Amino acid sequence: VCDGQLMTEIPGIFSCGNALHVNDLVDYVSASGELAGKSAAHFAAHTRDEVAVTISNDFGYLVPQRLDRTQDNSAVTLYFRSAEVLGPCRVVLTVDGNEVWSRRYPFLRPPEMQQLTLDFDKLGIADASDVHFEIEVAKA
């Protein structure tokens, strides 16, 4: 489990690259290494205010699983895989039960990692906010 700055549940310990999750491209490995390094430097000088990011069972995983509200969350890169092969579907983000973002996919497959970047700073996330991703499968 890590947050949007790649810090694990152990304060001051950061994870990146394939130690965090299996990446499809080496470019993603390098980008996560840079983010982890910058985040470690920020951690040394600041306190944290975290909120959990939860997912539905249709996800195999989603990274990050937490957001630190004291950080710049205007361009958080998320990576996820579906738990199973899915036909036409929609990934939906809700904050406190209100839909705030969605994206349609013609299909999702577990071997294919998906990447998206979201501006969480504009979503009004508070201390006790429920930040949740789910996959809605289109009905035939």
What is the predicted function of each stretch?
Residues 3-5, 11, 65, 70, ...:
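Surface-exposed loop/turn and secondary-structure junction residues enriched for glycine/proline
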Residues 47-87:
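Surface beta-strand/loop "capping" patches
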